[in-house]
């Protein structure tokens, strides 16, 4: 939608401080109270054409305008800005405040109080955030075990942080809250995990005692590449894959058929699971994999 001429161009799509633009003479308080402007936070506005209720970037920009000195975006908000798929729809913006800082509460804001040394702060896309290392460190020691692992895997996948560096960073901070959870997460973290649901499926199988398994295993026959599978027991030629909704698309479906036929010709058995299997029928999924493992081991033994 075209921006009306009376709307200053630099205020058309990004949040801004109301007091600042009024003092500059760009708008008046009466105009800001009109239907063209949305009040996001105290003294923070955005034009209605730039407003999206679930636009996390917009909310991060708005919150940044209200942040006290030495306070930055953190947690899942920082991870999302680094490109990690860890954010739920309508999630609040997470910020980390030094112990002495103050910030007015708001439903779209989640405040974490923690020491925040200079070396743990950086910029991404012009916004102040915790560094990738600090972001992974924080997410890996809070929340549920599965969500902590999902977040760490996602950041590792984006290659904004390396697992050895994260382990060293954590080892230097053994007394921080959540350290036992973080140690467990780092022991299971997998940089090759390609999606949050793949991480959940892998953890489900590991917790059931079905490991060890290999992530993103390349299947080859006679030196020729056949396919790469999500999770595998290479010696047994058994693979487990997570299928997201994109596998329903016609072109993707056709590629899947050809790929599965090639794996079958190479002597592999492939089990495929969806989000419903992992989240709603985990026991059935585990039982199916356990049975397949037993059958493949029996075949290998007989050979």
Question: Which role does the model predict for each range below?
Answer:
Residues 1-180, 214, 294, 301-303:
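Short gly/ser-rich loop at a beta-strand->alpha-helix junction or flexible surface loop bordering the NTP-binding
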Residues 9, 15-20, 24-26, 69, ...:
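Surface segments flanking catalytic/ligand-binding clefts of nucleic-acid enzymes
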């Amino acid at each position: 939608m075209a921006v009306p001429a009376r709307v200053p161009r630099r205020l058309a799509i990004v949040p801004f401080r109301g007091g600042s633009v009024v003092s500059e003479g760009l708008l008046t308080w009466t105009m800001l109270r009109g239907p063209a402007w949305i009040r996001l936070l105290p003294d923070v506005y955005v034009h209605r054409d730039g407003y999206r209720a679930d636009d996390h970037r917009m909310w991060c920009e708005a919150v940044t305008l209200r942040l006290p000195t030495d306070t930055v975006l953190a947690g899942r908000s920082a991870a999302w800005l680094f490109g990690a798929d860890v954010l739920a729809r309508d999630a609040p913006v997470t910020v980390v405040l030094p112990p002495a800082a103050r910030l007015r509460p708001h439903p779209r804001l989640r405040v974490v109080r923690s020491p925040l040394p200079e070396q743990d702060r950086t910029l991404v896309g012009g916004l102040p955030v915790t560094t990738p290392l600090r972001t992974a460190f924080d997410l890996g020691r809070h929340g549920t075990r599965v969500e902590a692992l999902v977040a760490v895997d996602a950041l590792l996948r984006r290659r904004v942080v390396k697992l050895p560096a994260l382990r060293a960073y954590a080892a230097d901070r053994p007394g921080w809250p959540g350290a036992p959870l973080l140690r467990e997460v780092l022991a299971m973290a997998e940089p090759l995990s390609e999606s949050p649901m793949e991480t959940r499926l892998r953890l489900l199988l590991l917790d059931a005692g079905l490991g060890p398994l290999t992530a993103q295993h390349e299947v080859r026959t006679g030196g020729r590449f056949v396919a790469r599978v999500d999770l595998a027991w290479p010696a047994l030629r058994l693979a487990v894959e997570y299928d997201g909704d994109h596998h329903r698309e016609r072109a993707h479906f056709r590629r899947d058929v050809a790929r599965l036929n090639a794996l079958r010709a190479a002597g592999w058995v492939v089990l495929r699971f969806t989000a419903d299997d992992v989240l709603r029928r985990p026991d059935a999924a585990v039982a199916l994999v356990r049975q397949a493992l037993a059958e493949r081991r029996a075949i290998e033994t007989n050979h």
